[in-house]
Amino acid sequence: MTEGKSIINANLTPLPDKVGVDGLEDKWRAVWDEDGTYKFRNTRDRKAVYSIDTPPPTVSGSLHVGHVFSYTHTDVIARYKRMRGYDVFYPMGWDDNGLPTERRVQNYYGVRVDVSLPYDPDFKPPFEGTDGKKIDAKDQVPISRKNFIELCERLTAQDEKLFEALWRKLGLSIDWSQTYHTIGQHPQRVAQKAFLRNLARGEAYQQDAPGLWDVTFQTAVAQAELESREYPGFYHKVAFRFEDGTPIYIETTRPELLAACTSLIANPNDERYKQYFGQYVYSPLFKVKVPILAHPAAEMDKGAGIAMCCTFGDVTDVEWWRDLKLPTRPIIQRNGRIVMDTPDWIEDPAGREVFAETAGKTTFSARKIIVDKLRESGDLDGEPTPTKRMTNFYEKGDKPLEIVTSRQWYLKNGGTDAKLNAELIERGKELEFHPDFMRVRYENWVHGLNGDWLISRQRFFGVPFPLWYPVNASGEPDYDHPITPSEDRLPIDPTIDVPEGYDESQRDVPGGFTAEKDIMDTWATSSLTPQIVTHWAEPDEASQALFKSTFPMDLRPQGQDIIRTWLFSTVDRAHLENKCLPWAHATLSGWILDPDHKKMSKSKGNVVVPNEPIEKFGADAVRYWAAAARLGLDATYDIGQMKIGRRLAIKLLNATKFALAIGREDENHHVGAAAEAAWNPADVTEPLDRAAMAKLAVVVRQATEALESYEHSKALEVIESYFWQFCDDYIELVKNRAYGTPDEHGNVPSEKAVKSARTALGLGLDAFARLLAPYLPYATEEVWSWMHAGSGSVHRAAWPVVDPYVEAATGASPELLTWAGKAVEQLRKIKSEAKVSMKTPILSVALSAASEGVDAIHAALGDIAQAGRVVGKFDLVAKHAEESAAEDAPETEVAVEASELGEPPVKKPKH
């Protein structure tokens, strides 16, 4: 860089008499909106664009500081990349479909869906907000599916406004013209188009199979949505009997499933049961004949070592049933209750009577009946013993999952295809994880998949499958030959739209058609966010240009807890559809913990609403707290950190105002006139100023390297550490020289020395405004406006490069500033220990330090003497390494060997 290019020209404005962070958010947010500061231009090629796959928050959830935490991490990177010259594509989406939204709408309006009801265009809900109270299903008003969807859309629109207001106040540099809703027309079109292409390639398929089922939400649940929780229960030792009445005992926590038993299973290597393999026993109470079989998945050390296989009690039952080709004997309905009709396989009259007593009962009630009957029959050995077992729950549910057989849609994800599994592992190796140790979580998940991705849900508010089925002459749907629309018709709702070649009168009649009534899992849409925001496969030129310049995307920021759901499913979809990764980098944030180091959650009642700390401390302060946390690690909600962030923002304002006011103040210390300045590195001539610039060059280099590696907290630490040193040491050391103030002997600093200090101050604070801009967008914009009036936003300014500061340093060591700071610290210590004013003169002093320290201090002796008010003799004593060691003092320390204080200044009387 030439000398001319290194010069920073400043247009200085009048300065406010008082500075503070209050009011900055509203002031600058309005300017950013008016100027389109964060708008994506899309005028350049892919290499000049940085695109972010922003997480669309679930708007049905309540706002909490966890949102502020992770989204700040993303915004720091977005702002940094924009300052690096990239055209940043930073959209925002709203995840507004799925079960959480439905549950919120049910409670908010007091309604539930009854698909048999017609649409009522004049419907008014019985409630308009219930203060978070849950309304029992029996008290909810039944409405049509269409009425329910309208209420979902109405409430999510309200919720989205709250989220947007928070994001804007926090200062997220989002392009608000680039927003989407996962239930909107465009995302629906993308999701349906991708599904139809998956179907055409054989990657999507439907199957009647046993699957996990949530009895509360009445829907199938995918493996990725499971949550293993400890659940209390009882072990029951139950006798099955051979033909001659000899018992063989199993232990079960689910005796209510005895009627669904198909076999007894033991490990083939279990010597206790080898003799029985191939023999038959009869189930207690129901007298159903079942075989004793071998399977390697049977655990010899669990319970009695032999277990009953029912259809279905858990996923192990499914494995045994599939591997051993056992009969299907389901007795649990989708509502979680025992079937009403006694099954045909129970032939014993007494057994049929027992079953009739359990018909229609919940599993809990049925269990009690069966246990009582087992006691009466003598088939219960001893009393049930308490136990706690890990049980599968739907992550949003509060009852254990059942396994029921139903027709569902699946998407291949490597769970049943070894080749695809290996390909997805390789995709994970291509992806840059930040932090890198998160990669193993992805790989463990992919390796552990035991089935394809179940993508259908038996709910209402979501993206419909774009399918119909022919209805045969007997009125049965032909699920093997789905009717699909052409892509140009998308999006469609098959419950409203009619397939080509049919008319509405043929709906649900023999020889006509019927709609697919299931909807897609919300993750089936969210997994396509890169394709949604980049307008994949849209026919218009603008969309094609957008896709070309933004896909594959650069960054996916997200929480560590949804690697298995969102991150993996997005990789799967891009691999199947685009034959590439959806993005190059993934950043993973940790969780927010409360002050007791417990994860914040609504159920625990320890959630903090984010508006509170923003109102109290300011957006910059809250952003500072969030940005100080390292990726991948949990962080504590810490108002102490926010106070530090607020203090940092205020210090930036005060330090910048102080430096810019030098030489411009009137007698009342008011700066009312504009001015121009040229901060030329060649004008930095004094050793201390050069040392400050040398350290600044190091900081710029380290901060840049950290942000390039997505280590935002490391960059902040480096910048902040030097900022405080710059303010506390450097400014204090040079302020007298910068003002041209004579020393204690009346010596006036030269114009060259004055200019050197003022130039270094200008270069330094200009750099800090830009270095801190990604973290403190409001305070930095304010000080930038004082320095560079009319030049636009600091957030569109160039990120600092080392060249001007290297040029200004001209080979100086940054350690000179460190030594000078330590020397001043010792001079202050003399006065603080004597309990006198810092304005008290020092008549004489002798400081000792290592030889390199003495040289550094000597180079800045004039500034140090003025800062410490040394008016007399100032001696420096060089200590050798062995002396420091003998005195147990670090070689980097400065010590006072002797000093003499003058008289403290007389306090002026208060008027």
Curated annotation (Swiss-Prot):
Localization of this protein: Cytoplasm
EC class of the enzyme, as a word: ligase
InterPro entries: aa-tRNA-synth_I_CS, aa-tRNA-synth_Ia, Anticodon_Ia_Val, M/V/L/I-tRNA-synth_anticd-bd, Rossmann-like_a/b/a_fold, tRNAsynth_Ia_anticodon-bd, Val/Leu/Ile-tRNA-synth_edit, Valine-tRNA_ligase_type_2
Pfam family, one: Anticodon_1
UniProt region (Disordered), positions on chain: 882-911
Residue ranges of coiled coil: none
CDD domains per the UniProt record, alphabetical: Anticodon_Ia_Val (cd07962)
Entry's Gene Ontology cellular component terms: cytosol
Keywords carried by this UniProt record: Aminoacyl-tRNA synthetase, ATP-binding, Cytoplasm, Ligase, Nucleotide-binding, Protein biosynthesis
Reactions catalysed according to its record: tRNA(Val) + L-valine + ATP = L-valyl-tRNA(Val) + AMP + diphosphate
Ligase recorded as keyword: yes
Gene3D superfamilies to which the protein is assigned, alphabetical: HUPs, Isoleucyl-tRNA Synthetase, Domain 1, Valyl/Leucyl/Isoleucyl-tRNA synthetase, editing domain
Main function: Catalyzes the attachment of valine to tRNA(Val). As ValRS can inadvertently accommodate and process structurally similar amino acids such as threonine, to avoid such errors, it has a 'posttransfer' editing activity that hydrolyzes mischarged Thr-tRNA(Val) in a tRNA-dependent manner.
Free-text domain note: ValRS has two distinct active sites: one for aminoacylation and one for editing. The misactivated threonine is translocated from the active site to the editing site.
Name of this protein: Valine--tRNA ligase
Protein encoded by which gene: valS
